[in-house]
């Protein structure tokens, strides 16, 4: 029988997705049709425990008007049960949505099959909002199934659980070879020249949106902040990431930002017409430079793409000049020495001929002030890796970098919570995206002359319903609808969103950048703090999300050069999509003696036997390694449990070249540290 592929996904009930629009085998799956004493097609039953069970048809459902629930104060095994006919030797997915209140003891709440006891979804316990659970299975010879919305385990579960939108659908089964255990082979080329990569791929991005800046790392008045308003705990955590470059102030925010209003003592709050909030304007150029200096990052400033080129040139003069009007202004504001900002962008996520001319003229104007700066502009944002040839033809000779943006789960208007496997199916998309950009450079005969700055990237975008960011919108800040839209942005802060899917997608993204080291100069995770970032700052402290640890491992444990390797791996499939089950990268120091290898096993539940060779030699022996994994692919860190997912140092045994890669894990292996 196929090993069960389990999926756990949590969302708020107001953002729940519709049930699968397929042929649902189950009757009355949303429990909308009542029958005498219950719901049509389902019956209540109990097994072990006290007889205090309460089966209820609840007046509110995840979707529709109803759901069903089970409750017990003393302990119970109980279910709502439906019996259905199915095809033999056929793959099905069983899923449902569960909400719980103080559910504890034994297993909890889940959906299972009574006459196929090994087929069961993950369980939900505690107090949780609507949570999707699912499992994939094959029926074998069975033609009839008893489906349980199950509560309990050994008669000891207490609390209450609600069930809704239970779905049993036939799905395409994996190919025959996927039925066998996945394997992989990594052959590291020890003879070909290695390539030095730019550590600026470990960069960050911050924007005046949500709680990234205010209420994030900059929070004057917080007991955790210093006299200048910087949260010291957040600053120390950012240092762990070895963040080499930080991009600011936007993002779409920059299209209404005028830098002179954010320097000096007389700073006035103003309406940010991009994000519909009042910008306090207390974090400006000087504060940004101080942030960068504190964490050891290069500052990267994105200019207002709607401003005139003189305003752009003046900002460069303010930051970098030693003499003149703007140098004197900077000195009057407390900084006699220039900031020496090296990286400047002309606008954010803009396109068209008017913009391209602005890029050309803005780059020329800025470089007249400081010829040493490196200029970038908006090249591609969104899933299509398309670069306007006119941009490269008109402004290419003034550019050192080209800004690329992509978020592979677009949460802008609709908050989505795809499951682990769906996220893994996206993990090879960055590689295809970068290849498309490089092809555009090649067609313009500019490969090697302009490098890629992937200066906004993340698996998930942040949530900002009602505001596109690209269009100005005047709002009434007292309007209840506007208040609700602004509040909805906090959905991006939910700890349960950031699972091993985020950690391993992040690893795959870095592997892509490392493989493309000759073309990718910079990458900035969006964002660095709060929203979808690796670091969650709350009023009482911080939580290092799963992808924080991925970033820290890559920034601290790799060597400085990328070696070639050949990777052969089986496929991990989900529906009609597939990716390699293993991803890997090898790095080496300048001497060729120290090696660090990163290996990712994307499989949610199975270990992978990986054969590793250094040239023609099978790797053998015990080596020190660092592993990042969790108790399940859906493991996450939160305020109550900040260390569910943390890196651990282990000793890894290679037996005749073969090493076991644990499921849903990242391994960083130090070959020089042989035990």
Model-predicted regions and their roles:
Residues 1-10:
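Bacterial N-terminal signal peptides
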Residues 15-187, 191, 262-280, 298, ...:
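Extracellular and organelle-lumenal recognition/adhesion modules and their flexible linkers in secreted
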Residues 175-418, 431, 435:
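N-terminal catalytic cores of secreted or lumenal carbohydrate-active enzymes
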Residues 354-510, 568-578:
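Noncatalytic carbohydrate-binding groove/subsite architecture in carbohydrate-active enzymes
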Residues 521-594:
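Glycan-recognition and catalytic regions of carbohydrate-active enzymes
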Residues 579-619, 625, 667:
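Carbohydrate-binding surface patches
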């Amino acid at each position: 029988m196929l090993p069960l592929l389990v999926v756990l996904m949590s969302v708020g009930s107001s953002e729940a997705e519709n049930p699968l629009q397929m042929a649902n085998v189950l009757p009355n799956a949303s429990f909308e049709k009542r029958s005498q004493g219950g719901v049509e097609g389902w019956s209540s039953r109990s097994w072990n425990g006290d007889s205090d069970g309460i089966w209820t048809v609840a007046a509110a459902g995840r979707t529709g008007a109803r759901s069903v629930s089970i409750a017990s104060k003393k302990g119970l095994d109980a279910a709502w049960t439906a019996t259905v006919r199915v095809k033999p030797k056929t793959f099905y997915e069983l899923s449902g949505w569960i909400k719980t209140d103080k559910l504890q003891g034994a297993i909890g709440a889940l959906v299972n099959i009574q006459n196929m006891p090994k087929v069961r979804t993950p369980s939900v316990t505690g107090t949780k909002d609507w949570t999707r659970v699912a499992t994939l299975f094959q029926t074998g010879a069975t033609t009839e199934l008893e489906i349980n919305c199950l509560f309990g385990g050994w008669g000891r579960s207490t609390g209450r659980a609600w069930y809704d939108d239970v779905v049993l659908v036939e799905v395409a089964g994996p190919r025959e070879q996927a039925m066998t255990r996945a394997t992989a082979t990594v052959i590291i080329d020890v003879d070909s020249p290695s390539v030095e990569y730019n550590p600026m791929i470990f960069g960050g991005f911050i924007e005046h949106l949500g709680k990234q800046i205010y209420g994030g790392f900059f929070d004057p008045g917080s007991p955790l902040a210093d006299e200048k308003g910087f949260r010291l705990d957040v600053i120390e955590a950012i240092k762990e990431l070895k963040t080499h470059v930080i991009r600011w102030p936007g993002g779409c925010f920059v299209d209404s930002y005028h830098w002179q209003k954010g320097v000096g003592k007389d700073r006035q709050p103003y309406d940010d017409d991009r994000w519909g909030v009042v910008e306090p304007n207390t974090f400006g150029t000087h504060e940004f430079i101080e942030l960068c200096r504190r964490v050891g990052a290069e500052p990267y400033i994105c200019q207002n793409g709607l401003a005139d080129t003189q305003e752009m040139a003046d900002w460069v003069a303010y930051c970098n000049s030693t003499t003149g009007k703007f140098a004197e202004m900077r000195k009057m504001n407390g900084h006699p020495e220039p900031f020496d900002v090296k990286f400047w962008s002309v606008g954010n996520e803009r396109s068209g001929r008017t913009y391209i001319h602005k890029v050309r003229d803005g780059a020329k104007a800025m470089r007249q002030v400081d010829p040493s700066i490196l200029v970038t502009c908006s090249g591609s944002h969104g899933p299509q890796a398309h670069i306007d040839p006119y941009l490269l033809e008109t402004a290419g000779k003034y550019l050192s970098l080209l800004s690329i943006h992509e978020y592979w789960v677009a949460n802008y208007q609709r908050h989505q919570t795809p499951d682990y496997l769906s996220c893994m199916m996206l993990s090879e998309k960055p590689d295809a995206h970068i290849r498309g950009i490089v092809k555009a450079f090649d067609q313009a005969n500019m490969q090697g002359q302009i490098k890629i700055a992937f200066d906004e990237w993340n698996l998930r975008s942040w949530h900002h319903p009602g505001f596109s960011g690209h269009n100005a919108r005047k709002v009434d800040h007292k309007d209840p609808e506007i208040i609700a839209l602004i509040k909805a942005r906090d959905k991006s802060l939910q700890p349960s969103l950031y699972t091993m899917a985020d950690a391993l997608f992040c690893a795959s993204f870095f592997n892509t950048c490392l493989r493309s080291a000759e073309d990718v100069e910079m990458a900035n995770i969006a964002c660095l703090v709060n929203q979808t970032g690796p670091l969650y700052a709350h009023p009482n402290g911080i939580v290092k999300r799963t992808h924080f640890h991925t970033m820290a491992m890559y920034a601290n444990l790799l060597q400085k050069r990328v070696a070639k390797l050949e990777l052969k791996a089986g496929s991990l499939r989900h529906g009609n999509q597939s990716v390699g089950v293993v991803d890997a990268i090898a790095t080496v120091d300048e001497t060729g003696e120290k090696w660090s290898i990163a290996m990712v096993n994307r499989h949610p539940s199975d270990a992978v036997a990986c054969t590793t060779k250094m040239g023609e030699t099978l790797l053998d022996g015990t080596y020190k390694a660092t592993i990042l994994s969790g108790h399940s692919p859906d493991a996450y860190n939160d305020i109550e449990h900040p260390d569910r997912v943390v890196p651990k140092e282990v000793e890894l045994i290679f037996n005749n070249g073969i090493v076991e890669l644990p499921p849903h894990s990242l391994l960083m292996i130090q070959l020089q540290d042989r035990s």
